[in-house]
């Protein structure tokens, strides 16, 4: 795993959120077709860049773009 690959996963994640709006972790995983660890790396990347809003609704983590 290298930085370029994580950047690609982050791009897939950003695109899914841009097209579909707020998604749960389960929905985001389905939309991106990423493995769980890949999705967490992508979310970390985008969160570090300040591009995500992460909240909890009914014990489910919800993610959207800022």
Where are these regions (language model features)?
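Short alpha-helical segments that sit at the start of domains
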Residues: 1-13, 40-41, 59-61, 66
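Short amphipathic alpha-helical interface segments
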Residues: 3-31
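Residue-level signal for short amphipathic helical patches enriched in basic/charged
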Residues: 20, 34, 49
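Residue-level detector of family-conserved "landmark" positions at structurally sensitive sites
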Residues: 27, 39, 56-57
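Short amphipathic alpha-helical interaction segments
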Residues: 34-45
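A short, conserved structural fragment
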Residues: 47-57
């Amino acid at each position: 795993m290298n930085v370029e690959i994580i950047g690609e996963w982050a791009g897939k994640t950003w695109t899914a959120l841009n097209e579909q709006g707020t998604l749960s972790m389960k929905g985001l995983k389905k939309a991106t077709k990423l493995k769980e660890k890949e999705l967490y790396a992508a979310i970390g990347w985008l969160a570090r860049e300040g591009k995500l809003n992460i909240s909890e609704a009914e014990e489910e983590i919800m993610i959207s773009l800022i």
